[in-house]
């Protein structure tokens, strides 16, 4: 039996709560996770009525496989042959990219919050961060984000603009810092993880266990991880 996600707030499934729910919904839809009999009846009724997202982290689950089947799956999944094939599989690469992007967005949110600026959402900021992650590690992108948010705060103090307008400049400053670094081939000091944003279980599974790189999804660029033997 798998206990409700909300019972273990320190053990994050993915880098953000919205993605947690997306993962759980996918596993339920694919009949990999089954609702445990210990789950309250009204929660399951809400799911049937397409009104379940707010309660999904309160559910208990059972895995729809026997222990031996799970052991065999783990053995196959962690074999060198499987990992080698996964490194070339688009779906696997997309998951790796998604984890790194979500970690970067979470840090951007946290950093803007420190400066009392609203979180910037949208395709544009995601595109900028993805461009950064093509070359740099998440720990280095943290550096771009930190200084980008700091520049946003300074811009807000200098100009008669509202906070949302100032926060929207984050993508401009992050992009500018990245382009300057690439143009002049500057060293980017990697940052440490912050206490409030620990490595997620999904990141640990993919990068530490499957790719055999301790917190590699944070410490190393993805292209480097996928090209290593």
Give names to the regions the model predicted.
Residues 1-229:
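Basic, alpha-helical nucleic-acid-binding regions used in initiation and control of genome expression
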